[in-house]
UniProtKB/Swiss-Prot annotation:
It comes from Acinetobacter baumannii (strain SDF). This is 1-deoxy-D-xylulose 5-phosphate reductoisomerase. NADPH binds at T11, G12, S13, I14, N125, E127, G215. One of its GO terms (biological process) is isopentenyl diphosphate biosynthetic process, methylerythritol 4-phosphate pathway involved in terpenoid biosynthetic process. Pfam families: DXP_redisom_C (PF08436), DXP_reductoisom (PF02670), DXPR_C (PF13288). The keyword S-adenosyl-L-methionine does not apply. Its cofactor is Mg(2+); Mn(2+). Mn(2+) binds at D151, E153, E231. Its EC number is 1.1.1.267. Keywords: Isoprene biosynthesis, Manganese, Metal-binding, NADP, Oxidoreductase. One of its GO terms (molecular function) is NADPH binding. It catalyses: 2-C-methyl-D-erythritol 4-phosphate + NADP(+) = 1-deoxy-D-xylulose 5-phosphate + NADPH + H(+).
Amino acid sequence: MTQSVCILGVTGSIGQSTLKILGQHPDKYSVFAVSAHSRISELVEICKQFRPKVVVVPEQKIAELKTLFAQQNISAIDVLAGQEGLVDIASHTDVDIVMAAIVGAAGLLPTLAAVKAGKRVLLANKEALVMSGEIMMQAARDHQALLLPVDSEHNAIFQSLPHNYLQADRTGQPQLGVSKILLTASGGPFLNHSLEQLVHVTPQKACKHPNWSMGQKISVDSATLMNKGLELIEACHLFSISEHFVTVVVHPQSIIHSMVQYVDGSTLAQMGNPDMCTPIAHALAWPERLQTNVPALDLFEYSQLNFQAPDTQKFPALNLARQAMRAGGLAPTILNAANEIAVEAFLMERIGFTSIPQVVEHTLEKLENTAAESIECILDKDKVARSVAQQYIKYWRLK
């Protein structure tokens, strides 16, 4: 019997890699529902091949989608709109597995809906957990959802931890013999740039990652090291560990995806070629394994693997994220919201590359940090933080 899959963000890089794996295993998985934000022509091609029962797009894209469906003689697919539609498919009774791959805060509510519906949730949307933190993790426990990490680093940590680690008490301290998590980072395309060179970075250059094929937003986050900062926060929540037990290690080759150190001196690492199909396949089938077309790692190709500490002077975003996690409450929500606005402004060439962390720092300083008591207060703070960041950028440009 096949398992039914819902893919939130099907036209993005994670969504495409997920389809690749599902297409290789039609005897195990079927696509029940998908969502897309803007690439409607690509969505139609996906629907022709995988024939989902339900599709969700923004309200303003429904007419375009239905026109293309009619032209391609595609029928028997329900079309839903907006956040309500996303929540509906993520929590649908016919869905077994939800791939949460919507980028940014927009993925929070549908991801939480999937968790509250007790689904197997493959978490690629790190921002959802950065914002909701323990609310999301408590919901997973209350509703017996299986929350499995898809980010290569968190998937590597998951594979390197004791098999029952997620069932251990959530104390913020390492459990079951674990002493530390080593979160690896490629360092991004500007690892060896000077501060002066970073001032002149363009969006085109920032979107060219040396090792991974990714969307624009995550590529820029990787270049600023904010992506690693968000992943640090995600790791703290997923594995219930305080931020000072998580060390970021720059590893330019992206072969070791992360490591776990133990009290007996052991260090366990998960290694592999940088291909998102590997962690996706792992999360889909865990505790079993799926065949993929990812080549096995050839160790003879690598004469050496390099490691170094991150330069937080050149890349202050990492420390901003660590400070937000340390502060707790709504600070991570403020951090994430301001970063999304700043990255969007950079991609539109409204601010420079080195201005991104400055916008984030200003917004964190401007807003009061209070307890994250509910999803409603998280969403309210997200909205306010975006407004503050936008106003700061607007003022900056007028100076």
